[in-house]
Amino acid sequence: MTTITEELIARLKQGIISGVDLQPRQVNVGTVIAVGDGVARLSGLDQVVASEIVEFPPKAGRNESIYGIALNLEQDSVAAIILGDDESIEEGDLVTSTGRVISVPVGQGLLGRVVNPLGQPIDGKGPIQYEKMRPIERIAPGVITRKSVDTPVQTGIIAIDALIPIGRGQRELIIGDRQTGKTAVAIDTIINQKGQGMVCIYVAIGQRRAQVAQVVGTLEKYGAMEYTIVVSATASESAALQYIAPYAGCAMGEEIMENGVMLNGQLVKDALIVYDDLSKHAVAYRQVSLLLRRPPGREAYPGDVFYLHSRLLERAARLNEEYGGGSLTALPVIETQANDVSAYIPTNVISITDGQIYLEADLFNAGQRPALNVGISVSRVGSAAQTRAMRAVAGKLKGELAQFRDLAAFAQFASDLDATTKAQIERGQRLQELLKQPQFQPLAVEDQVAVLYAATNNYLDDVPVAMITKWRDDFLAFLRTAHPEVRKLIYDNRLDRKFPTPEVKEALEAAIKEFKATSNYS
């Protein structure tokens, strides 16, 4: 039988006390006075600051803490949006302020993963290994730290790379009605970044879970997940999580822009982020604002809905060499209703971004895919974001397509056209056919240049309009197999100010003539 001695009691006391932190701590504690619809009204948190995280500690029936963000600071109460399920939070529950703002894990460990807006993995591949966290909200880089956009982001889509080029550090809006191929353009761009030294982030806001799973499956199929991070806030998530999702994705992108990650043994400091889509993001923020009883404005959106998107998109930048030379390129997506680009959210985002890719339902239904309306689409960075080779061949293309649009409109009302006008219209139709491209089949820059050179130098004038896409596919297959040296020559000289150099011109024209001599498309 063991006897309890004074020495044993002393040891027990020592053991218990040594495991307890007896230092005094000041904690700002309050209580929940009302909760519902993802919003909690709190009393007693007199030291909380705007956007601070508040914690609802574990209690009977709830083993984990639930967190929220304090957004409305009123005279006698604080309103906080709850990040997660609010069903276990009740009136009278304790709540504490944490002194922190919301942060997410960033860095190497996120590559190839699917996470929620809090940076927690949802792909079943285990915990994420990370070394640091970053606040999701941050002031955009200043004017002094930036550099002008001069390096292209090759989308692999010939119509975009030739007519509406996107540069590293640019914000290019993808806008159009539902089911016009907006996500397809973004996913094609991500797939084309393989081997280009670019990390991609895809932020899904308010989408169906099946749709997000389909996107992830597509990226895995084409080997793009190894350099991609997917941030998912689906339609089943709370409006609060949908609201913070793009900011979380942007913080992950900023880490890459500033400090870089290792990709295939190289340090990569260029990131591309897709926000799909900001229309649903604005709706989620409207829901949060109305629940917080903020006064509604136009279309019931709160007064700061412009600032909601401007502070997000301004964080995309190209840094100068003194600050690391990294870049964050943003491709926000906006869904319009019945082609109405003059609605509130579309006009807001158009005015914030550096151009827009406008996809039209009528063109999509007519078989023009990508359904790019060249007339309304624009890139404010322009040819500064193109290689010299693409600039040389695309310059003529823009003018000829503009001329074709004018003549096509005129031809609708004219019964008899002269031969020159007919030839110009047919030429425009050929060029338009050339810009059609199947999904998930991005073209390398040397292939785009070769095809556009042939088109703008009258080598396609004897090919029937219906055979143009077949001609393009066969010609590129011929170049890859019979003349890979021509493709290499174009790629090696793509930055030459005098493109096409006599050497490139001679080799390319010889290859085109050889192909025309061995094929028949009449």
Curated annotation (Swiss-Prot):
Its EC number is 7.1.2.2. ATP binds at G176, D177, R178, Q179, T180, G181, K182, T183. GO terms for cellular component: plasma membrane; proton-transporting ATP synthase complex. It holds the Pfam family ATP-synt_ab. Its main location: membrane. The record marks S377 as: Required for activity. It is found in: Cell membrane. Signal peptide: none annotated. Keywords: ATP synthesis, ATP-binding, Cell membrane, CF(1), Hydrogen ion transport, Ion transport, Membrane, Nucleotide-binding, Translocase, Transport. GO terms for molecular function: ADP binding; ATP binding; proton-transporting ATP synthase activity, rotational mechanism. It is a peripheral membrane protein. It catalyses: ATP + H2O + 4 H(+)(in) = ADP + phosphate + 5 H(+)(out). InterPro entries: ATP_synth_asu-like_sf, ATP_synth_asu_C, ATP_synth_asu_C_sf, ATP_synth_F1_a_nt-bd_dom, ATP_synth_F1_asu, ATPase_a/bsu_AS, ATPase_F1/V1/A1_a/bsu_N, ATPase_F1/V1/A1_a/bsu_N_sf. PANTHER family: ATP SYNTHASE SUBUNIT ALPHA, MITOCHONDRIAL (PTHR48082:SF2). Produces ATP from ADP in the presence of a proton gradient across the membrane. The alpha chain is a regulatory subunit. F-type ATPases have 2 components, CF(1) - the catalytic core - and CF(0) - the membrane proton channel. CF(1) has five subunits: alpha(3), beta(3), gamma(1), delta(1), epsilon(1). CF(0) has four main subunits: a, b, b' and c. HAMAP family: ATP_synth_alpha_bact (MF_01346). Belongs to the ATPase alpha/beta chains family. This is ATP synthase subunit alpha. The lineage of its organism: Bacteria, Bacillati, Chloroflexota, Chloroflexia, Chloroflexales.
